[in-house]
Amino acid sequence: LGTLQSTLTDFKYLRKIWKDNTEEERLLGVSLTGIMDHSVLSKTVDSRVWLEEMREVAIETNKTIANTLGIPQSTAITCVKPSGTVSQLVDAASGIHARHNDYYIRTVRGDNKDPLTQFLIGEGIYNEPDMMKPDSVTVFSFPMQSPDRAVLRGDITAIEQLELWKVYALHWCEHKPSVTISVREEEWMDVGAWVYENFDIASGVSFLPHSNHTYQQAPYQDIEYEEYLEWNMRYGRTNIDWTKMTEFEKEDNTTGSRELACTAGVCEVVDLSAG
């Protein structure tokens, strides 16, 4: 499908150089997600052979279809994306990241002009006005439970995260894997040394302090098992009638889906549809 899509290079409002570059490279993004949920692919040793074999299949498939279409083969195909949206839909660990906690509240922000926002409010999904934009953004909260024996954010060190990233950078990705590393206070010196030693390949990596601090309406908020049960009892919904969306969706309004990105104490509403 991606190879077919790479033929769509008629950019009406961009310079010819962009069209030429796109036709020359035809970059694809065949990504893996749920990596930390997999018993083999989450390991730094056992996964290498499998990753190289899967990468070869992706490359050969693109080559075969490109030859059939009479277009150049893509110069880069495989990657690891953050996968925030897909992972939520299929209940998988996000990209190459561990799951947040055994039990947590996941908040999602919606533009009040978005029909989906109004639909969820009407269906009784727990919601409250966004603290920063109370007149235009609504925050929905969902109680989440990780699977048994899931790898959690607190189970692995920063260096273990980086070493797994390196395996994927060398044995799977033609692009660079995207990852955000949670770093405990006592780990920063070791992390700095690792980056220095791997400077030639270290890109696509972000670092955030590993913190148990939870602020109001944070995207992920740790809760205990009892709180999870209470949330489900009071606000849990399993009988949402999605056919009613047609009553709200009268026009194309795809720019309304938004999620809050928070780093260094600053939060920004990000348009999910732009990615």
Labelled PLM ranges:
Residues K19-E24, S42, D46-M54, I181-E185:
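Conserved short loop/turn motifs at secondary-structure junctions
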Residues L1-L14, N21-E24, P82, D91-S257:
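Catalytic alpha/beta core of large soluble enzyme barrels
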Residues T9-L14, G34-P82:
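Internal maturation/activation junctions in enzymes
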